[in-house]
Curated annotation (Swiss-Prot):
<feature type="compositionally biased region" description="Basic and acidic residues">
    <location>
        <begin position="144"/>
        <end position="163"/>
    </location>
</feature>
<dbReference type="GO" id="GO:0007399">
    <property type="term" value="P:nervous system development"/>
</dbReference>
<feature type="region of interest" description="Disordered">
    <location>
        <begin position="132"/>
        <end position="163"/>
    </location>
</feature>
<dbReference type="Pfam" id="PF00956">
    <property type="entry name" value="NAP"/>
</dbReference>
<comment type="similarity">
    <text>Belongs to the nucleosome assembly protein (NAP) family.</text>
</comment>
<feature type="modified residue" description="Phosphoserine">
    <location>
        <position position="10"/>
    </location>
</feature>
<keyword id="KW-0963">Cytoplasm</keyword>
<feature type="propeptide" description="Removed in mature form">
    <location>
        <begin position="389"/>
        <end position="391"/>
    </location>
</feature>
<feature type="modified residue" description="Cysteine methyl ester">
    <location>
        <position position="388"/>
    </location>
</feature>
<keyword id="KW-0449">Lipoprotein</keyword>
<keyword id="KW-0539">Nucleus</keyword>
<feature type="compositionally biased region" description="Basic and acidic residues">
    <location>
        <begin position="1"/>
        <end position="10"/>
    </location>
</feature>
<feature type="modified residue" description="N-acetylalanine">
    <location>
        <position position="2"/>
    </location>
</feature>
<keyword id="KW-0636">Prenylation</keyword>
<dbReference type="GO" id="GO:2000179">
    <property type="term" value="P:positive regulation of neural precursor cell proliferation"/>
</dbReference>
<feature type="modified residue" description="Phosphothreonine">
    <location>
        <position position="64"/>
    </location>
</feature>
<dbReference type="GO" id="GO:0005634">
    <property type="term" value="C:nucleus"/>
</dbReference>
Amino acid sequence: MADIDNKEQSELDQDLDDVEEVEEEETGEETKIKARQLTVQMMQNPQILAALQERLDGLVETPTGYIESLPRVVKRRVNALKNLQVKCAQIEAKFYEEVHDLERKYAVLYQPLFDKRFEIINAIYEPTEEECEWKPDEEDEISEELKEKAKIEDEKKDEEKEDPKGIPEFWLTVFKNVDLLSDMVQEHDEPILKHLKDIKVKFSGAGQPMSFVLEFHFEPNEYFTNEVLTKTYRMRSEPDDSDPFSFDGPEIMGCTGCQIDWKKGKNVTLKTIKKKQKHKGRGTVRTVTKTVSNDSFFNFFAPPEVPESGDLDDDAEAILAADFEIGHFLRERIIPRSVLYFTGEAIEDDDDDYDEEGEEADEEGEEEGDEENDPDYDPKKDQNPAECKQQ
């Protein structure tokens, strides 16, 4: 046994001597290549990987395990960084307050354009020929002959039809074109929304708590007496003292609707149901009429009330979360770009954005799948342990 051990030791010493001689002859680049190869071999060894994992698990058993293992003096410096982060959040809050001031300032500049939009939609103003000229995209351009033919056809149709005023059902069409809004609109809501003339957004004044109001302007109708229905959203743009690191810009904290003065028998947010009840003793049957809530877009103006404690049940929380999303979408997208949602162009742009991301993901998946299905594919050839992407 001793002779075998001595022989193995001798062979090992010889191997080491050979390695030393080779290393003396190799260039620095060759040494790097060998180091890479050795690293690859080590990382493919299950025993080595298991040992490394065990060591890492012991060092960092929880996400904060490493932080807890730091010396006290280092922890103090980390706390200093956290205090700096809080100050960054406070500056960011100030930034968003100034953005809100800019929104209010530019809302005044946008308003004359929105006023003219309102007048065109509601047949108060008839745009001139020059204002109606629109150069289509290159792919939409057609020959002069086809243009003339289309013009003649349009004139014939206009003669056959009664002359429409403004742009009929403008806002209803916008709502029906947008999934987020069309899901709210029921069939019994549509006749009412045909009377919707305009939607406006009003920002809180300087020095007031951050908020905005959505105004829905209606023409006189047979359903309610209100000329304007409002929805007010209260916002906060400051870090929460209890969790300052969660601050990520202004957030909607609550909302208030308005009372709709429905005309008799026209309240679409309620419905009457009839229920038969059988008397247990006598066996007689009676019909009971009961009024219950009904799905409707106009429930948007009666959001759940948030108690002072702030505690809400799951249903109320879900309703408010959806409500906030809708309010934000109306303010940021629908009101400024309504004509593009009316024509569907804004929706196509949104779909294109999602399609591009989806196509990229699909292409990546196809490439990976092709490699795996290729019998000649060798995953080791793709490994490059020398590269390290910087985050």
